[in-house]
């Protein structure tokens, strides 16, 4: 069935408290999607961010980002007083995010809420801790230890803690019991709000497309707690790290620095770690977009310590064996495969065997540096078409920065006009395509330019900061989108029920 959606990170929602959150503005955006004839809300990873603020470099693949906890919602439930957060200066303009200010000020507010909840722990909290015992205790201890070590990477901790010696872990849990409890409560508060928001979206007939990074960060509880799942040496350092080879976009390639999975070791357990990971993602999202799908067919391995990706080499990935194990344990989860970048026959064969929809990016169709065919007339139906992703310029930014030969090709192919706006013409291109699902960036819907770009790969600073202004998603804009969805056969068959916009009533009590 033809459908459409909008890519809008949680962090980019309007907010009076420094960053987008899972409260009233999130529900308003869901209502906008429904009125605009959309069926999907695609987001970026919602895991905690670390240095550099990238959601693709997280302290945990299972935890939620504490910054996304809506403070007004906590106040409604008696966990915060207005004076504890309403007058805080988050040191950012309404259309951007200051992560340094968030780090310095947000956790102090959350500790106020956590202390009130811990004074009277309720059944819902105890149930959450029990149900998430497969990751929560390790995560909470990891974060408490990071606090105790002034944020230092776990590789710099004392040897008994680095190697997770049982006596050292037991002593740490006792010594830092209050901090461990705080980090557990924060995750309870996050998932209470997330589950309420997702339930609200689903009642409005909006499915959530979540994002799963293929790799995890070296400084993460995932590597610290499960070193046997990764390619590490006797000192627990990576032997090689992840990245991408040099290409037309980068002469030195991309050095991501993530540790690589030990696929041989994982195979011996039936890929149990990955099954747990996918099961969790399917429990919090309706659809899971797996980043860098080509890494499952073959992955690029760069010697640890190298400054660029120039001297890496290709290694064989797990192939279909991983997805067969997932299917055996979980059935057929709804997965989108991010199959962009350097593609080879083994990648195409794996995608075909899995049956997952791949991705097509319209901006790539006119980029003379890209050898793939991303023109809409060549799209298969089983794919997701995008104007661009979080790693691309918004359409207006692309026209301002791309080579004129490329932009002229786009104008000719799509018959774009300045009167309508190039961004509307490009969005029409993906909506009119044969792709089952078309997703456009929120920045394109709003007609924004380079200033709203979410991320520029291989750069540090200035990324992940864009926020929409309050009131940007107007009723008139929703009406225009709804008309275009009808025009291109992407309007959902069933509208949301009349009472779906009521304030969520099934949120766990906090």
Predicted regions and their residues:
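N-terminal regions that are enriched for targeting/export leaders
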Residues: 1-11, 27
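Alpha-amylase-like alpha-glycosidases and glucanotransferases acting on alpha-linked glucans and related
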Residues: 9, 15, 53-191, 216-439, ...
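Catalytic domains of carbohydrate-active enzymes, especially glycoside hydrolases
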Residues: 24-49, 284-285, 430
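Surface-exposed amphipathic alpha-helices with a cationic face
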Residues: 34, 194-202, 327, 351-352
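Outer-envelope exported proteins of Gram-negative bacteria
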Residues: 44, 207-209, 213, 287, ...
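Conserved, well-ordered alpha-helix/loop/beta-strand core segments that scaffold catalytic motifs
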Residues: 183-216
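Structured C-terminal cap/extension of enzyme domains
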Residues: 447-499
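Long, low-complexity, intrinsically disordered segments
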Residues: 500-510
């Amino acid at each position: 069935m033809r459908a459409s959606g909008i890519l809008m990170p949680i962090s980019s929602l309007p907010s009076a408290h420094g960053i987008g959150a899972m409260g009233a503005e999130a529900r308003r955006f869901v209502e906008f999607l429904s009125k605009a004839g959309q069926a999907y809300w695609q987001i970026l990873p919602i895991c905690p961010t670390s240095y550099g603020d990238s959601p693709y470099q997280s302290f945990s693949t299972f935890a939620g980002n504490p910054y996304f906890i809506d403070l007004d919602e906590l106040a409604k439930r008696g966990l915060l007083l207005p004076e504890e957060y309403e007058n805080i200066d988050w040191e950012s303009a309404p259309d951007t995010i200051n992560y340094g200010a968030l780090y310095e000020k947000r956790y102090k507010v959350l500790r106020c809420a956590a202390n009130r909840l811990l004074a009277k722990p309720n059944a819902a909290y105890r149930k959450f801790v029990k149900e998430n015992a497969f990751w929560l205790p390790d995560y909470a201890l990891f974060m408490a230890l990071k606090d105790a070590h002034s944020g230092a990477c776990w590789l710099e901790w004392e040897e008994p803690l680095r190697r997770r010696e049982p006596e050292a872990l037991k002593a740490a849990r006792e010594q830092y019991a209050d901090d461990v409890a705080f980090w557990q409560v924060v995750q309870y508060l996050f998932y209470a709000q997330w589950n309420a928001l997702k339930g609200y979206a689903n009642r409005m007939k909006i499915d959530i497309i979540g994002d799963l990074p293929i790799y995890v960060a070296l400084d993460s509880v995932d590597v610290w707690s499960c070193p046997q799942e990764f390619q590490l040496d006797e000192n627990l350092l990576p032997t090689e790290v992840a990245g991408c080879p040099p290409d037309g976009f980068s002469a030195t390639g991309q050095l991501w620095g993530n540790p690589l999975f030990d696929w041989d070791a994982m195979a011996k357990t039936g890929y149990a770690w990955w099954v747990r990971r996918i099961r969790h993602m399917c429990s919090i999202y309706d659809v899971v977009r797996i980043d860098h799908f080509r890494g499952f067919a073959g992955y690029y391995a760069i010697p640890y310590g190298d400054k660029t990706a120039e001297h890496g080499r290709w290694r064989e990935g797990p192939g279909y064996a991983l997805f067969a194990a997932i299917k055996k344990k979980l059935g057929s989860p709804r997965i989108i495969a991010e199959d962009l970048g350097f593609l080879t026959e083994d990648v195409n064969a794996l995608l075909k065997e899995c049956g997952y929809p791949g991705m097509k990016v319209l901006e790539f169709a006119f980029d003379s540096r890209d050898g793939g065919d991303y023109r809409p007339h060549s799209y298969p139906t089983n794919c997701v078409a995008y104007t661009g992703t979080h790693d691309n310029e918004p359409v207006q930014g692309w026209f301002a920065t791309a080579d004129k030969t490329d932009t002229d090709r786009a104008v000719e192919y799509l018959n774009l006009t300045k009167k309508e706006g190039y961004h509307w013409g490009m969005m029409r291109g993906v909506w009119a395509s044969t792709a089952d699902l078309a997703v456009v960036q929120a920045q394109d819907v709003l007609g924004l330019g380079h200033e709203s770009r979410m991320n520029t790969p291989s750069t540090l600073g200035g990324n992940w900061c864009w926020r929409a202004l309050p009131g940007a998603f107007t009723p008139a804009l929703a009406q225009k989108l709804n008309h275009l969805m009808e025009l291109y056969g992407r309007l959902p068959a069933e509208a949301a029920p009349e009472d779906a916009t009521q304030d969520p009533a099934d949120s766990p009590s906090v």
